[in-house]
Amino acid sequence: MYAVFQSGGKQHRVAEGHTVRLEKLEVATGETIEFDQVLLIADGETVHVGAPLVAGGKVVAEVVSHGRGDKVTIVKFRRRKHHDKKMGHRQWFTEVKITAINA
C-alpha cells in the first residue's frame, strides 16, 4: 500500500515504514503529525485518485528529526569585469517516518 500526499508545495510517494525528508515543519521531535492533503492511495488491487484530494484520506507520520541539508554553492560571474560573487545555502528539513496510511 502506498500513497501520494502534498506537503510544503511538493508531492511525496510513501509507504508505511518509509522515512521521508520534508520542508521544515514547526513540530517537535517525537510528535505525530497527520497529512490530510492525500492525492492518491493505492492498496495493490485498487487505486483511489482524488479530485483533487481523496475524501477521508490521511497519512500519519512521526517526526524523527530536524536538520539542514547539504550546502549548495551559488556562483555569480561577470565576464571580463573582475567580478564574481560566491554564496552558499543550506535548506532546513524535517525527517518523518510514515506510521499509517488511512483511506
Swiss-Prot record:
GO terms for biological process: translation. The keyword rRNA-binding applies. One of its GO terms (molecular function) is rRNA binding. InterPro entries: bL21-like, bL21-like_sf, Ribosomal_bL21, Ribosomal_bL21_CS. The keyword Ribosomal protein applies. It comes from the Bacteria. One of its GO terms (cellular component) is ribonucleoprotein complex. Keywords: Ribonucleoprotein, Ribosomal protein, RNA-binding, rRNA-binding. Belongs to the bacterial ribosomal protein bL21 family. Part of the 50S ribosomal subunit. Contacts protein L20. HAMAP family: Ribosomal_bL21 (MF_01363). This is Large ribosomal subunit protein bL21.
